[in-house]
């Protein structure tokens, strides 16, 4: 009887140890799942944040484009007004010339009149050419800035779509590389460690996401440089 009682006690202790181990295993798995869900939520929030930044960047570029269009319209209006002033000045010079010619017809020197008229014509012509050069330079500058604007928007959208595609298929790719197994192991290390070592394990856990963000930034700069060239 004593032997049977002893065996019964040993069996009960073994069962209790087995149940305790199963409970600890379930708690560890639950903790890992919570960490995984937290990281997935952070990843989703980061995508939403990037989307808001893209929308803000496009809005700012649109405002700058509208401002440049207003500046170009103001330059065109100024050129039109200046041209009208030049035309009015030319008519005034012509009328003054005719009036002077009629008044001093008997005393006038034809060569002197021709020289004065040529001076006025050349002066007006040079002013017109100068204004045309300024307008041409402004137009070229506007086209260059507009090209840079469209290039920046195109590069941003392309990189954002590539990043979204990578994030979509990245989970399967990480599973193929057994990154999830590695992260589960790191999660168990995080639970078991404390202090500075725990911080290092957290950094190791988030390293794939840090590398993904770095890849996104590098890819954006590379595509933007290609479009700019």
From Swiss-Prot:
Keyword annotations from UniProtKB, A to Z: Plasmid
Q: In what ranges is there compositional bias, type Polar residues? A: 18-31
**Which residue ranges are recorded for the region named Disordered?**
1-31
Q: Specify residue ranges for compositional bias: Basic and acidic residues.
A: 7-16
Extract the InterPro entries matched here.
DUF334
Record Pfam families:
DUF334
The extra comment attached to this record reads: PS194 is a streptomycin-resistance plasmid.
Q: What protein name applies here?
A: Uncharacterized protein ORFD
State the species of origin.
Answer: Staphylococcus aureus
């Amino acid at each position: 009887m004593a032997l049977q009682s002893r065996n019964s006690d040993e069996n009960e202790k073994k069962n209790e140890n087995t149940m305790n181990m199963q409970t600890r295993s379930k708690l560890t798995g639950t903790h890992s799942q919570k960490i995984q869900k937290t990281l997935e939520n952070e990843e989703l929030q980061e995508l939403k944040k990037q989307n808001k930044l893209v929308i803000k960047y496009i809005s700012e570029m649109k405002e700058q484009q509208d401002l440049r269009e207003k500046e170009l319209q103001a330059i065109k209006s100024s050129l039109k007004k200046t041209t009208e002033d030049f035309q009015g000045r030319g008519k005034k010079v012509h009328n003054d010339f005719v009036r002077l010619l009629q008044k001093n017809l008997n005393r006038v020197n034809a060569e002197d009149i021709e020289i004065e008229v040529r001076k006025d014509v050349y002066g007006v012509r040079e002013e017109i050419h100068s204004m045309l050069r300024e307008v041409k330079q402004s137009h070229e500058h506007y086209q260059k800035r507009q090209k840079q604007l469209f290039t920046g928007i195109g590069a941003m959208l392309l990189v954002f779509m590539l990043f979204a595609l990578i994030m979509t298929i990245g989970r399967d790719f990480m599973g193929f590389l057994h990154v999830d197994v590695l992260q589960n192991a790191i999660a168990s290390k995080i639970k078991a460690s404390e202090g500075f070592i725990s911080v290092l394990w957290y950094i190791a856990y988030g390293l794939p996401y840090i590398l993904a963000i770095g890849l996104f930034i590098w890819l954006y700069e590379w595509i933007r440089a290609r479009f700019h060239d």
